[in-house]
């Protein structure tokens, strides 16, 4: 079978007239070391939904912004966002086998003012609402009986990264007496370590999450956890709930106390506002807190439909990212939250972005002739300033930086020291980094020279609340989707994980064959890897 990887996409992106304008503009980008002024910092700001996006320290001019807006129009980015939120099939590759389904995660929070009127979106929202009601009744009963105090979630990938990141972000709101534990890695030490922290298995609930009901790592960890309960003389069925699609092996009343549903139109990395996140976040913080989280996500979904670019924060951020990636040729982005509560947030957005847009073919199945998703990485500030910011300031590669920040801290506990509070010191540091990266410094000592022109943007809100956290999630989800729409790629599948799974299963069979000592090897190169383990016998 001939695969058309040798051909490149002939019809879009660099052939847009806006792209040609941007290529010309990129030959002489704005020099931030000369052009950054107080007026520019004041002028280049977009505001919506309680957030301000400060982008005066990006290397853009009004001409660049006009061309970027034109690019979004030529690629029909807003139309595609509307179609996605209406439930049209957006997860597809033309003429090749693909998942061929909607990407309707927005329906899981489309439960408030101005809901979508398209039939598929309404039907999906009603399904999500029914599951939330089922969850409310389940948790209400548990609270009345004060039965389960600890929750263990067994999941992997987006079913783990997203909920876990948002749990840490809201941990200051944890209900008294409640504790949450996470198991994801198939490394048995993950399970063993968690169970050393659980005080009473009798009062422990386990939520197993797998859309397909067959995820190998999750199934393996589930069996390890079930064995812990059996060893304690407890019936796992009375402690286990499942979150899966209807009809999967995990949709089984004989094995689970309760089953909550998700659907094939929700991708794992987009599943935090579905039951994947709802059960754990509602158990930990209460369902009203989760409801506020959904409200924030819904509001940013609506903002993503704004035709005014200066109010459509996700689209503007997407276009700034495309300018940096495709026209200034910066291959990576450091995502730096100046909030310790967001210590796992970059890991989640890393998956949302890189699994969505790490694609080398377009939706016609043709190899792209342009770069797609950047490498996303980072850690919270100010800690990161004392680790990898040296490279960002003086390294040979230009690394754009996206900063998340809040005016106020979470607990309201602070101290004035040497004339300022800790929060003021935090804010001073993040603004200083943006300024230093943009303007640089000239010195007679070359070791103290900073070249500048390192672009940054700052997403700023008053305070991290359940509402703003939901909006923040939607901001990044929609930003990533917009970039995929403009590039013409499928942001909603993840074939890149499949080949490794196939080969891992062959190696697993090789381990099993060696244990049985009955079958000769059918996977010689795999056997060659395993022989290295014999050295440690």
Curated annotation (Swiss-Prot):
Pathways per UniProt: Carbohydrate biosynthesis; gluconeogenesis; Carbohydrate degradation; glycolysis; D-glyceraldehyde 3-phosphate and glycerone phosphate from D-glucose: step 2/4
GO molecular function: carbohydrate derivative binding; glucose-6-phosphate isomerase activity; monosaccharide binding
Swiss-Prot/TrEMBL GO biological process terms: gluconeogenesis; glucose 6-phosphate metabolic process; glycolytic process
Taxonomic superkingdom: Bacteria
InterPro entries recorded: G6P_Isomerase (IPR001672), G6P_Isomerase_C (IPR023096), Phosphoglucose_isomerase_CS (IPR018189), SIS_dom_sf (IPR046348), SIS_PGI_1 (IPR035476), SIS_PGI_2 (IPR035482)
Chief subcellular location: cytoplasm
Keywords noted in UniProt: Cytoplasm, Gluconeogenesis, Glycolysis, Isomerase
Record GO cellular component, one term: cytosol
Entry's EC annotation: 5.3.1.9
Pfam families xrefs: PGI
Gene3D superfamilies named among the record's database cross-references: 1.10.1390.10, Glucose-6-phosphate isomerase like protein, domain 1 (3.40.50.10490)
Compartments (UniProt record): Cytoplasm
EC primary class: isomerase
Residue numbers annotated as active site: 355, 386, 501
PROSITE patterns for the chain: P_GLUCOSE_ISOMERASE_2, P_GLUCOSE_ISOMERASE_3
Catalysed transformations (reactions): alpha-D-glucose 6-phosphate = beta-D-fructose 6-phosphate
Function summary: Catalyzes the reversible isomerization of glucose-6-phosphate to fructose-6-phosphate.
PANTHER family per the UniProt record, alphabetical: GLUCOSE-6-PHOSPHATE ISOMERASE (PTHR11469:SF1)
Entry's family note: Belongs to the GPI family.
Protein name: Glucose-6-phosphate isomerase
Lineage, opening ranks: Bacteria, Pseudomonadati, Chlamydiota, Chlamydiia, Parachlamydiales
Protein encoded by which gene: pgi
């Amino acid at each position: 079978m001939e695969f058309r990887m040798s051909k490149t996409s002939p019809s879009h992106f660099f052939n847009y007239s806006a792209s040609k304008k941007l290529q010309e503009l990129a030959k002489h980008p704005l020099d931030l070391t000369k052009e950054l002024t107080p007026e520019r910092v004041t002028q280049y700001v977009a505001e919506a939904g309680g957030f301000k996006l400060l982008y005066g320290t990006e290397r853009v001019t009004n001409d660049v912004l006009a061309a970027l807006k034109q690019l979004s129009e030529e690629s029909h980015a807003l139309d595609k966002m509307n179609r996605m939120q209406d439930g049209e099939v957006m997860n597809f590759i033309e003429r090749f086998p693909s998942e061929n389904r909607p990407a309707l995660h927005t329906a899981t929070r489309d439960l408030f003012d101005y809901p979508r009127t398209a039939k598929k979106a309404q039907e999906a929202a009603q399904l999500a609402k029914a599951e939330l009601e089922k969850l409310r009744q389940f948790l209400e009963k548990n609270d009345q009986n004060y039965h389960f105090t600890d929750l263990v979630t067994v999941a992997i990938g987006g079913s783990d990264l997203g909920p876990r990141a948002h749990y840490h972000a809201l941990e200051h709101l944890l209900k008294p007496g409640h504790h949450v534990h996470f198991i994801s890695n198939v490394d048995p030490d993950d399970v063993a370590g968690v169970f050393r922290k659980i005080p009473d298995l009798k009062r422990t609930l386990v939520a197993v999450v797998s859309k397909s009901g067959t995820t190998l790592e999750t199934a393996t960890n589930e069996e390890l956890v079930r064995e812990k309960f059996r060893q304690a003389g407890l019936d796992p069925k009375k402690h286990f709930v499942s979150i899966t699609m209807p009809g999967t092996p995990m949709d089984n009343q004989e094995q689970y106390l309760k089953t909550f549903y998700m659907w094939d139109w929700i991708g794992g990395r987009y599943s935090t506002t579905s039951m994947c996140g709802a059960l754990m976040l509602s158990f930990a913080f209460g369902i009203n807190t989760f409801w506020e989280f959904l409200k924030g996500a819904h509001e940013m979904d609506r903002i993503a439909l704004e035709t005014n670019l200066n109010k459509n924060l996700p689209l503007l951020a997407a276009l700034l990212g495309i300018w940096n990636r495709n026209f200034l040729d910066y291959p990576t982005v450091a995502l730096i939250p100046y909030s310790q509560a967001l210590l796992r947030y970059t890991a989640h957005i890393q998956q949302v972005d890189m699994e969505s847009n790490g694609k080398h073919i377009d939706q016609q199945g043709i190899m792209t002739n342009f770069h797609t998703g950047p490498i996303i990485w980072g850690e919270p500030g100010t800690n990161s300033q004392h680790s990898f910011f040296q490279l960002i300031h003086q390294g040979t590669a230009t690394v754009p930086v996206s900063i998340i920040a809040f005016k106020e801290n979470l607990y309201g506990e602070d101290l004035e020291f040497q004339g300022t509070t800790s929060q003021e010191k935090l804010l001073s540091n993040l603004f200083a980094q943006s300024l230093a990266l943009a303007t640089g410094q000239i010195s007679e000592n070359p070791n103290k020279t900073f070249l500048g022109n390192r672009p940054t943007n700052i997403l700023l809100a008053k305070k991290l609340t359940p509402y703003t956290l939901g909006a923040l999630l939607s901001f990044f989800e929609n930003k990533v989707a917009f970039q995929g729409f403009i590039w013409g790629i499928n942001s909603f599948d993840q074939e890149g994980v499949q080949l490794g799974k196939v080969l891992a299963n062959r190696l697993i069979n090789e381990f099993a064959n060696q244990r049985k000592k009955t079958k000769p090897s059918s996977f010689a190169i795999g056997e060659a890897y395993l022989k290295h383990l014999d050295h440690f016998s």
